[in-house]
Amino acid sequence: MRFMQNRPFAANKAVSTALTLGLIVGVNACLSPLAVLARTSDLSALSGPAGFASEAAVGKEALHFGEGFKQMTPDQSKQAEALIKELDTINQNQRTNQSIDQVRRLGQEASKLYNAGQREPALSKWQEMYGLAQDIKYSEGEGEALSNMARFYVDAKQYVKAKYLGENAIELLANSSEQQTLAKARIALAQAYFGLDNPVWAIQQLDAALKILNLSQSKDPAEAASVMYLCASLCVQFNKPKDAIRFYQEAATYQTQANNYGEAVRIRATLVGLLIEMGWFTAALEEAEKVMSIAKTAPTDSNALQIPALQATANAQYALNDYAEARRTYDKLFALLPQIDQKMISEQVKANLNNGFGFVLAAIGDYDQAKQHLTAAFNYFKTVRDNFNAAQTANAIGVLEANEGNYGKSISMFQQAIDIHAVISPRAVKLNADTLLNMAAVEYRSGSFREAKLHLESAVAITAKLKNSSMRARLYQALAEILYKSSDITNAEANINKAIAEADKVKDDSILWRAYVMKSRIQKGRQEVDLAKESITSALSYFRSPQSGDFPTVDTLGFPVSREDMAYYLAEGLASNGMTEQALLAAQQLKEENFVMEWMRQGGQVKPEDKDVFLEMSSMRARLHSAEAASTPDQLTKEWQSWLERFRALSASNKSLARLISPMPVSIQEVLSTVQKNNAVAVEYLCGSEATLAFTVDSQGRISSTRIAFGRDRFKSQVRTLLASVNKTAGDTAPGENIRTVLASLYSELFPAGVRQFLPKTPDQMIVIIPDGPLFNLPFAALIDEKGQYLVQNHLLTMASSLTVLLDSSPAHNDDFSIVMASNQAKAELDQISNAVGPERVTVLQGKQIGLSNLEEQARGKSALHIPAKVAFPENNSLRSMLPFTVEVDGGARAISADRLFGSKMGNDLIVWSASSVNSKDGKGNALKIMSRGLGYAGARNVLMSLWSQPDAQRIDELVNFYKNKQAGMNPAQSLRKAQLAAISKDPDVKNWAGFQLLGPGY
């Protein structure tokens, strides 16, 4: 996890892939592509750079190579010429097989000494080898000796000496038949050039080595592969990743030719990691497919080789934000593990796999399983003192615990990570600072402001020498948030100013918007009205920047104040300064951000024709956010502009897909015209930690905002109590007083006078409720007003997850009332609805007919799709819920998860999910939000879902009346209201009639 610090999983898992392979099948794998330089092979003698740099370019340096390498002024006399001829004759006579073998033995002895760490004795042996080879005029031996001596000086960082040695080696080997030796010499020269900061000539030498190997059609492809791997490693070491790619590819090709499938898989897995590091995520996935192809065709150990291949694939999928597919890939991997000889699977392999799978599970919200896998990995890393991975994994577990509100456990894990950092060498400063920031964020949220301040001050101290304005700005901003909460306004403002100064240097909008929100709050507290308005206007400008968007990772908490709460302060500040329209748009942007992040986290699927664009655009956005951590935002301005141009084009051609990738700008005029066209009143809520904003938009073009003095946690508690009470009292004859009290309290809180004055006077005009967080799980129809009546008795209601749902709604798809019902159960429900509306209007799918493809075909042209399956949505990931539908796999049928529906085409006016139920612990309302938006993307205009499972008799009766009303020409909102009124007249108990929630425009 070392390539990209803010995407630790995506980077390190590729490295772990190579390590995993080495530990499973016994190849000489390494922890990173660079570690090959330390491998114990003959090639390890070629670890340096060189080329054709002039003496002026590299400077002069006295060289002492022994008596056999003296630079002398040539003697032009005839006696000298005759003497040379005579010596040549003598040397030719001395060059025998025995003398050549002696030269080679000296080289082998030198290599053994060098690999054993005895470098000086090795150098002496190579010098002796060179002298003997020169005596017998054995140029190949001379060249090999010089190459190895060049390696010695490269390792000693004496690059000028290494350069001259490498150049002489190439001159000696230029006309040699030993082309492999010449290729190695060129690599040695390339290493020297790299050391002299001459990468252009270094790459030329590596290219020349590659050409030699390709033209010579080496009889030893394994040796050629090793040379190519070394070339690739050098390119990585000296930051030439694009050049490294082709050398890795050549190395893998040679290893395949040599039937070394394990090495071929390892090299291509390493290449996957490099491509991920470079941000070429799609190319990484394509390369991972090649890894799997090699693994499957391996004549032996195929299953074992598929483990790193699957891991490489999961890495690429994770990098592409395709978290659901990454999860499925890991599921395949762990299903395959038992088929491998367990003796081949070391504890380190298990730790690597647990670590990778844990990060994927955390990304999709399966926190319990994620903690199990990460804890297993952490325990191993800690035992073997793999301190970096131990610290990073402990930090990730701490973030998981914090996300679940387990602050005590979270702080304990962060403290362990901090303690481990004390013994990490070299120091991982950024990871340490991130952990301290995470610790401070949790302490802030648990009320330990003093401890949070101390940990942030430690983070500021350890990063003081780093030339990283973004990091400094982030720490100053975090410290300001803690100081503000501690009422230390003076120091809070001082740190805000520091944060602004540092962030402005690198145009870091993600910090600037937060800093100006805080600055405005301080100024408003001092009654500096004009300055406060100026600051909040600046904050809004930065907030709208795509670079400031939220892109959370599984190992960071961001800031002490969550993005949701800081955005609430932004909206509240705008509204209090008379900028209500801008406040409403800021609230919309925040909600769209939250939806996009939750969609990606849960693994929402898209239509096949949209998948490539979706993955490319979303991964490009993720890559830009990741790159900001490695560089600075100002260096990525052109890339962001390019991304925005593509996003605008996509928004114009495929708006529904664009909304799954990033928030789209919305204008107030669009909002007003849509509300007026629908003759509706929109009531939108934005929940903060301490208070809530209620916006109203009516058909007369009026926009208002009202501050409600209750925050998110209060509503979460009330809704949870309500849902628990409803489920607990199932079967009772009357609603409990507790339920009525909660419903009446919620009405008075959510509909204060400032909101009620804009509500319609008659039920002929629609109210569109746009909730936030826990309010998604609230049955608004059942709220009890000051007269003791349910809200639905006086108003026509629908719910939308966002104003954009209204903006994007299309006209009715089909005026002809017809229903497709799909279920293997619920016969009574299907029969009663069919009898009520007429069997000729109902198509019932059962058994094998409920395949997804057939369902999609049968639903085409129908006005409604009815799904009576009982589905209880889990707390963290509703899309993992299993449905009664199937898809064909390998000639058989397999049940599918809820997310697969979104990739289909369901062009229906209405989809009814009649027996769903939400989890009372789902405090964000994600189940209804994600399911309704996903089905809307698939083509549905309205979605009717149930918050809890009503008693069957009352539920079916309400559904029958709903469809009768729909058949009579009413729209979905009118149909549901009339059915609920009929149910209330029979039994006013909330649990028996208020479970259904309509999401969509309502018409």
Question: What positions do the PLM features span?
Answer:
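Eukaryotic all-alpha helical interaction scaffolds
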Residues: 114, 126, 133, 153, ...
